[in-house]
Amino acid sequence: MPLVALVFLAVNLAAIGVVARGSRTLWLLPNLALLTFAVLYLLPIFTRPISDSIFLPILTANISLALAALLFRGLPVAARRHKPPIITGNVFLLLGVLFCSIGVFAVYQSLVASGGLTSVLLDYGGRGYLAARVNGANSGILGVLAWASPFGLAMLLAAWLQQPGRYGVFSVFLVFFGLVMGGYFLLTVRHNAVATLLMLAAVVFRYRGFKLRSALLFALPLVAVFTVFQAVRVAGVGQLGLGSIINSTSQSAEHLEVTEYMIEKTRFDGYTGFSQMLDLPVFLVPRVFWPEKPRTSTLNRLYFPEQASVGSEKSPGIVAEGYVSWGYPGIIIVSFAFMGLLSFVQARFDRLKDPLAAALFAAVFVPYTYMGVRTGVFGKHLVPVIFIYLEYLVAMRLARLGLRLRPRAGNIRPD
């Protein structure tokens, strides 16, 4: 199996190289999905034995994603023409500060609700904090609001890249970056931290173009964040060290274990028929209007009912989600739908003429690219993407409003 995995890893890299041609951003979103899949599903095969029951679904998903990426790469993309930024002055800076403040408030309010700033890190450890935090009436909305800070950081970084001489803006960015990542570490939430770094990478690549040096600069903190956060969740901060990091990383195959368990159980219980798609309207309803709203996703209630009371989530990932929905055809459907959406978004991303708007548009969907492979394509994980997209629409609406008001202020400059 490791030899076959090595072959498919090479196929993944070849597909990434082919679809990246002709795109200033190397066709970022679909390629990020392929790379994430390789890291999460193919690389662990070299460190742990797995059965045929999970190996074949993984390869089916891998082939489907690669083929879909190649097929959808033919989407027409208009020529890019760069125009002056659509947002100028301090409006953009203020929006970034506003979104960062909302996200930071949500993260630290979650810490307070769980017993104190360091209670999750020192007292509970791992997933234990969910029992203390998730039963709060505002836990759901706080989790959604926490996604405001990554988009705010993307706005601040884009504002600085737009005018690199404004080091005051960069200083504000660094302050909020420290607060945001510090809060994520105290909560031991990996998804938010990894997605934040990926969003910032998308902004930099859109402004500066893809460079190997920049990619390595982002890859190193990504690896550090994922491994350290994983070690903290598995071993606890008291046992944190090089040995625990290496051990937890080499044995970190929870998504593979969950995938294997769900596939085996499905063969006895039957397919779910994409019932997880009902999660999206359910989780968009505030708990204040529906006190008995489920605390976990449909798939978790079906496959892990013993943990539903504390809201713990076992991430099925794209492979298990597709298989439990409709077997191997389900894997193909989910893979093609996921890659089709990413390719459509990427085509629009490359068509946007303004670099600032393009950078923010990419930042909206980068978290979904990572979470779709890691936690599932459909269901409640779409809620953060919808929230971030609403933030994007607010920013663009204010930009258009500013363009309408600018002629009245006499601020039009001749071309």
Predicted ranges, named:
Residues M1-I87, F170-L174, V180, L200-F205, ...:
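N-terminal "leader" segments that precede or initiate the main folded domain
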Residues V4-V11, L94-F105, L142-A154, A320, ...:
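Hydrophobic alpha-helical transmembrane segments
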Residues F8, I58-L65, A146-L156, R190-V203, ...:
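Hydrophobic core segments of transmembrane alpha-helices in multi-pass, intramembrane catalytic enzymes
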Residues A20-L28, L156-V172, A347-L360:
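Membrane-interface helix-loop-helix junctions at transmembrane boundaries of multi-pass membrane enzymes
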Residues P76-F210, L222-G238:
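Membrane-embedded catalytic interface detector for glycan/lipid assembly enzymes
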Residues C100-S119, S214-T296:
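Aromatic-rich transmembrane-lumenal/periplasmic boundary elements in polytopic membrane proteins
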Residues M155, K314-D415:
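Hydrophobic alpha-helical segments
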Residues D279-V319:
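Interfacial juxtamembrane loops and adjacent helix segments
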